[in-house]
C-alpha cells in the first residue's frame, strides 16, 4: 500500500538533504532545516524527481570513488552545500585511501553485480558514511578512466557480453 505524500513528509526528521534523482554535479542539492523551507522549495523543483536523505554533518568534502572493473579512482570535491564551492575535483591516489574504504567500495560492486559504478562518501564525526551509489556515474576529468573504460569494453567483448 502506498503512503500519501503528506504521510511521508510528516515522518521526516530535520535537517534533511534534498537532491535531484539525476546527477547534476551538485547543482540541485539543498539542506532543509524545517518543513517550511521544504514547502518553500517545492514550487522550484516541481518537475524534478528528488531524493531526501538524512543530513550527516561532515568535514565539508565529498569523497568520490569511481570503479571500473575493480580499478578504483578517487577524488575529493567540496560539498555542494557550501556557497560558492568549486566544482573541481582534487584527485586522490588509492594509496591515500584507507583500506576499509577501498574494500567496502569493491564489496558494493560485488553486492550489486556492478563493474562500472561510483560511490560517494562523507567523513563525519562518527566515521565515513556512504551517501550514494551510482550505477552509471560520469567519469569526465577522472585521470586514467578513459583507458580503464576501453579495457573494460574490450574485456566484455572477449567475454561475449557485447558484440559489434
Description of each model-found segment:
Residues 60, 114-116, 125-128:
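Coil-to-beta-strand transition motifs
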Residues 13, 69-70, 125:
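Residue-level signal for tight coil/turn positions that link beta-strands
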Residues 22, 27-112:
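Phosphate-binding site of ATP-dependent enzymes
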Residues 16, 51, 73-74, 117, ...:
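Protein kinase-like catalytic core scaffold
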Residues 17, 122-123:
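Conserved protein-kinase catalytic-loop segment immediately C-terminal to the catalytic Asp
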Residues 1-28:
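A conserved helix-loop-beta module that forms one wall/lid of the active-site cleft
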Residues 96, 110, 123-164:
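C-terminal active-site "lid" helix and adjoining low-complexity regulatory extension at the edge
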